[in-house]
């Protein structure tokens, strides 16, 4: 019986040592970086992503945002109207908000009154607007990646996206790589 316990303890110690080594390797490869997958196109959730991003960037943490699916509406420039879209792409363009100013709330949207009230409160309390947050994020070096697959599925084109200094187009594998090397990951 004692021999079995010794073998078991020895096996456990080897497993603990292997895990300790693996965790050490993972921690060593982590950067002071925040990766956020922004999937929701709701005003309150895009605001949350930007507030967290700005806070992290102000603390010298590298920030990488990955905009996918419904959140792409926030990155559409209402002044840009690309040509050559098929019927379904045009319909998505009509049905979805065009730009940050047209986003709705996830709760209490109240036919558009909710976003107006939030924006009024933000202004009254000297909170930056979403446009100002994106401008500051650009100045702080926050990177935004637009999911190419989502963009294609929803019929959006690169020509209709906002002008942003650190904007790139890539797939989900890019976000997985960014998240894998980040000390913090969020999904909004």
What residues fall within each predicted segment?
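Short, glycine-rich nucleotide/cofactor-binding loops
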Residues: 36-47, 75-78, 121-125
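Short internal beta-strands
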Residues: 63-69, 145-148
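Histidine-anchored nucleotide/phosphate-binding helix
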Residues: 47-65
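Glycine-rich, aromatic-bearing surface loops/beta-hairpins
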Residues: 122, 146, 151, 159-188
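N-terminal beta-loop-helix "entrance" segment that forms/cooperates
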Residues: 72-84
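Ligand-binding beta-strand-loop-alpha-helix segment within the catalytic cores
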Residues: 117, 123-149, 166
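A glycine-rich helix N-cap at a beta->alpha junction
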Residues: 83-122, 126-129
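Long, leucine- and charge-enriched amphipathic alpha-helices
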Residues: 1-33
